[in-house]
Amino acid sequence: MADITDIKTILYTEKSLNLQEQGVVVIQTSPKMTKTGLKAVLKEYFGVTPKSINSLRMDGKIKRFRGRLGQRNNYKKFYVKLPEGVSLENTEA
């Protein structure tokens, strides 16, 4: 079962800020999170039922550290369309 601890952060990038005007919030989570799990977490902790959820899996970048190759963590990104007049910033978790 998905938990609130699986949500890493709400992303604030140029693209996500433009999407917020259309009622879409971009959420970064652990790779094991699913759409139904995220929907349950949003309903339980934020009291919000999303209109739609789109997801994509992001592979961690390959980086060099002290001459050796390493990899950043993989994560999932969700685009959550919220109902009119609802935002996650106004709710208390």
Curated annotation (Swiss-Prot):
GO terms for cellular component: ribonucleoprotein complex; ribosome. It comes from the Bacteria. The keyword rRNA-binding applies. InterPro entries: Nucleotide-bd_a/b_plait_sf, Ribosomal_uL23-like, Ribosomal_uL23/eL15/eS24_sf. Keywords: Ribonucleoprotein, Ribosomal protein, RNA-binding, rRNA-binding. GO terms for molecular function: rRNA binding; structural constituent of ribosome. GO terms for biological process: translation. The keyword Transmembrane helix does not apply. Part of the 50S ribosomal subunit. Contacts protein L29, and trigger factor when it is bound to the ribosome. Belongs to the universal ribosomal protein uL23 family. NCBIfam families: PRK05738.2-2 (NF004362). One of the early assembly proteins it binds 23S rRNA. One of the proteins that surrounds the polypeptide exit tunnel on the outside of the ribosome. Forms the main docking site for trigger factor binding to the ribosome. This is Large ribosomal subunit protein uL23.
